[in-house]
Amino acid sequence: MIIGIGSDLIDIRRIENSLQRFGERFVNRCFTDIEIAKSDARKNRAASYAKRFAAKEACSKALGTGLAQGVFWKDMGVVNMPGGKPTMQLTGGAAARLQEMLPVGHRAAIHLTITDDFPLAQAFVIIEALPVAPAEGTV
């Protein structure tokens, strides 16, 4: 069952301006080490950061908190699954909020799609609660 949906649309030029104006202070405040390494290696660095920024905003909306109630920028990070598909890795307050949302006997699956077409970057997040299969041999 779907327990959270969030979306965000951002102007890449806004992130370009923040990168120029605040540099590493902005990057280190908002992004995880994995996101920084990936984005800094990209040809279009600002677009890469913008997609990740939009993903964090969308995820915070799907969590129902926005960037409040103990959910911070670096609690949410875009990571890639082995096949390359992006997803969100949650820690800290974001992970705690996700656990609060889950019905008993369920685990979370976070679905993420990110895209950019200058001057815009966009992200959608769907949080799904999936039933946990009972362990074999239990009654």
UniProtKB/Swiss-Prot annotation:
<keyword id="KW-0444">Lipid biosynthesis</keyword>
<dbReference type="Pfam" id="PF01648">
    <property type="entry name" value="ACPS"/>
</dbReference>
<feature type="binding site">
    <location>
        <position position="57"/>
    </location>
    <ligand>
        <name>Mg(2+)</name>
    </ligand>
</feature>
<keyword id="KW-0963">Cytoplasm</keyword>
<keyword id="KW-0443">Lipid metabolism</keyword>
<dbReference type="InterPro" id="IPR002582">
    <property type="entry name" value="ACPS"/>
</dbReference>
<keyword id="KW-0275">Fatty acid biosynthesis</keyword>
<comment type="function">
    <text>Transfers the 4'-phosphopantetheine moiety from coenzyme A to a Ser of acyl-carrier-protein.</text>
</comment>
<protein>
    <recommendedName>
        <fullName>Holo-[acyl-carrier-protein] synthase</fullName>
        <ecNumber>2.7.8.7</ecNumber>
    </recommendedName>
</protein>
<keyword id="KW-0276">Fatty acid metabolism</keyword>
<feature type="binding site">
    <location>
        <position position="8"/>
    </location>
    <ligand>
        <name>Mg(2+)</name>
    </ligand>
</feature>
<dbReference type="GO" id="GO:0005737">
    <property type="term" value="C:cytoplasm"/>
</dbReference>
<dbReference type="GO" id="GO:0000287">
    <property type="term" value="F:magnesium ion binding"/>
</dbReference>
<keyword id="KW-0808">Transferase</keyword>
<keyword id="KW-0479">Metal-binding</keyword>
<dbReference type="GO" id="GO:0006633">
    <property type="term" value="P:fatty acid biosynthetic process"/>
</dbReference>
<dbReference type="InterPro" id="IPR008278">
    <property type="entry name" value="4-PPantetheinyl_Trfase_dom"/>
</dbReference>
<comment type="similarity">
    <text>Belongs to the P-Pant transferase superfamily. AcpS family.</text>
</comment>
<dbReference type="GO" id="GO:0008897">
    <property type="term" value="F:holo-[acyl-carrier-protein] synthase activity"/>
</dbReference>
<keyword id="KW-0460">Magnesium</keyword>
<dbReference type="InterPro" id="IPR004568">
    <property type="entry name" value="Ppantetheine-prot_Trfase_dom"/>
</dbReference>
<dbReference type="InterPro" id="IPR037143">
    <property type="entry name" value="4-PPantetheinyl_Trfase_dom_sf"/>
</dbReference>
